[in-house]
């Protein structure tokens, strides 16, 4: 469909700021009904693009029937999910030369109390450089006392900013470093500056989309995009209505806006249903892990703090390939490792957190973050070489508290200070933390010992010495169901003293199977 777009069309040529023209738009058809006809005279349920839900009202392309509550085949579900993942990119493709504009709030609730503008700009710059072909050509920190107004800045600063942007023909777009822009604000700024303007939400969401690998992550990104589609809908439909007499689809009694809003609601419902199916599968996997009684350690931290590198160092898994960029990990993965006690644990790599991360993104990734709530221990990785390490810690803890995690899980959290090799002579000033360098391998044994003790305490496992008969099945059962640390054979008795780490439930089974 030609008209309604959730984002910038790929390859769209942006007008130069010096020419004072907005980006060209396609000519509108004479009425919304003709726009619908342009897609092949399909029914509203068949609209394509970011608003449509697929090729039909049923996942298999057929029509749904009243009272038809049979479960759809799995391959139909797969096809329907792929349809939901289709959509236009949120940001323009190709090389972009970005002007980074940071509003420096001087007072009021919008003023950050724990950070400085220069570090906020540095993080925003890192976000831009995460995108292929994007570079920051100008950075402007502009003070404001009115961040909630439509144009964000005062009259004098706004005029000065507009003059600089329009006078720089090398600028192709502006990244306004605010969490979200209202649709009227975006419209006014783009009209004033002559280039497209993006906020933090849009940039981060586009990075999420680029880095999502599994279907679950891609569906969660699609769900997070829904507020953006809604905010763009009114603007795009208003453009479609310009010069049009009727706003209603012929014979439907439904306006074009109402139609698109309904399609959005239907698409969101389908995404949530698909995520619910995947959530149930994830629940089954967790049950299997629980039956095998592997302790689970969720590794959390600020984005690019070195979580994946640390997991690779702890497990020795050569298949793990860390990347030095923001939000490199969006898909939760589990990796087995062995602690000094010979206990096998699963390290769960999670999505990195970010300050001013829009709440809707966290909500959309709730299925992924459920793994944190079901873990036995949380390992909080901090990049102590970063000048904003304390602010990053506060952001992570605030996000974890927002997940409604059990209090014992938060209280037992282990904190590790990573990248100490970048801070000469580093010595932690906080108690109960472990300094390491995941890249250099420093401090890993101390960290494993700390995790060993913490897992034993968190899971209620106990270290016991059990005497077993060598001729029986007891020893092989213990090797399968517990962690055998040491076996001291007593030949004259035909027995052995076995030192094990065993859970309460496994010990109960052992006593029941081998009484006496």
Swiss-Prot record:
Required cofactor(s): Mg(2+)
Keyword flag Hydrolase: no
Composition-biased stretches (Acidic residues): 68-82
Tissue expression pattern: Ubiquitously expressed.
Record-listed Mg(2+) binding positions: 308, 329
Residues in Hflx-type G domain copies: 295-459
Pfam families: GTP-bdg_M, GTP-bdg_N, MMR_HSR1
CDD domains in the cross-refs: HflX
Compositionally biased residues, Basic and acidic residues: 57-67
Entry-linked PROSITE patterns: G_HFLX (PS51705)
Claim: Metal-binding is one of the keywords in the record: yes
GO molecular function terms attached to this record: GTP binding; metal ion binding; ribosome binding
Matches recorded under InterPro entries: G_HFLX_dom, GTP-bd, GTP-bd_M, GTPase_HflX, GTPase_HflX_N, GTPase_HflX_N_sf, P-loop_NTPase
Residues binding GTP, per UniProt: 301-308, 327-331, 349-352, 418-421, 437-439
Keyword terms, alphabetized: GTP-binding, Magnesium, Metal-binding, Nucleotide-binding
Compositionally biased spans, kind Low complexity: 18-39
GO cellular component assignments: cytoplasm; mitochondrion
Ranges where the record places region Disordered: 18-82
Family according to the record: Belongs to the TRAFAC class OBG-HflX-like GTPase superfamily. HflX GTPase family.
Additional comment: The gene coding for this protein is located in the pseudoautosomal region 1 (PAR1) of X and Y chromosomes.
Protein name: Putative GTP-binding protein 6
Gene of this entry: GTPBP6
């Amino acid at each position: 469909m030609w008209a309604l777009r959730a984002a910038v069309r790929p390859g769209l040529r942006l007008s130069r700021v010096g020419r004072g023209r907005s980006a060209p738009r396609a000519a509108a058809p004479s009425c919304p009904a003709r726009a619908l006809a342009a897609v092949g005279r399909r029914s509203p349920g068949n609209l394509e693009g970011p608003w449509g839900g697929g090729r039909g009202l049923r996942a298999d392309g057929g029509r749904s029937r009243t009272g038809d509550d049979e479960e759809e085949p799995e391959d139909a579900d797969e096809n329907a999910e792929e349809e939901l993942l289709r959509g236009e990119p949120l940001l323009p493709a190709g090389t972009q030369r970005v002007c980074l504009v940071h509003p420096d709030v001087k007072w009021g609730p919008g003023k950050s109390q724990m950070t400085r503008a220069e570090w906020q700009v540095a993080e925003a710059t890192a976000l831009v450089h995460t995108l292929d072909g994007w570079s920051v050509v100008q950075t402007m920190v502009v003070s404001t006392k009115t961040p909630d107004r439509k144009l964000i800045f005062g009259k004098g600063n706004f005029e000065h900013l507009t003059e600089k942007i329009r006078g720089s023909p090398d600028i192709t777009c502006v990244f306004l470093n605010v969490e979200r822009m209202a649709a009227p604000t975006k419209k006014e700024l783009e009209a004033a500056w002559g280039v497209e303007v993006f906020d933090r939400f849009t940039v981060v969401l586009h990075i999420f989309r680029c880095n999502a690998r599994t279907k679950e992550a891609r569906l969660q990104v699609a769900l997070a995009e829904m507020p953006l589609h809604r905010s763009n809908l009114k603007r795009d439909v208003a453009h479609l209505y310009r010069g049009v007499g009727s706003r209603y689809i012929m014979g439907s009694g439904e306006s074009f806006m109402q139609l698109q809003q309904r399609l959005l609601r239907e698409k969101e419902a389908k995404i949530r249903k698909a995520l619910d199916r995947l959530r149930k599968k994830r629940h089954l996997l967790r049950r299997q892990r629980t039956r095998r009684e592997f302790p689970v350690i969720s590794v959390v931290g600020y984005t690019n703090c070195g979580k994946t590198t640390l997991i690779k160092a702890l497990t020795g898994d050569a298949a793990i390939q860390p990347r030095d960029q923001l939000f490199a990990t969006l898909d939760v993965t589990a990796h087995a490792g062995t602690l000094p006690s010979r206990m096998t644990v699963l390290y769960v790599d999670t999505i990195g957190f970010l300050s001013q991360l829009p709440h809707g993104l966290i909500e959309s990734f709730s299925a992924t973050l459920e793994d944190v709530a079901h873990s036995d221990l949380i390992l909080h990785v901090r990049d102590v070489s970063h000048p904003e390490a304390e602010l990053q810690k506060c952001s992570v803890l605030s996000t974890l508290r927002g997940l409604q995690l059990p209090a014992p899980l938060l209280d037992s959290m282990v904190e590790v200070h990573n990248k100490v090799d970048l801070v000469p002579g580093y010595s932690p000033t906080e108690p109960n933390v472990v300094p390491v360098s995941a890249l250099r391998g420093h401090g890993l044994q101390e960290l494993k010992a700390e995790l060993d003790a913490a897992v034993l305490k968190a899971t209620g496992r106990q270290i016991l010495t059990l005497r077993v008969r060598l001729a029986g099945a007891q020893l092989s059962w213990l090797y399968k169901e517990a962690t055998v640390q040491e076996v001291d054979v007593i030949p004259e008795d035909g027995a052995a003293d076995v030192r094990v780490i065993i859970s309460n439930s496994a010990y109960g089974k052992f006593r029941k199977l081998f009484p006496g």
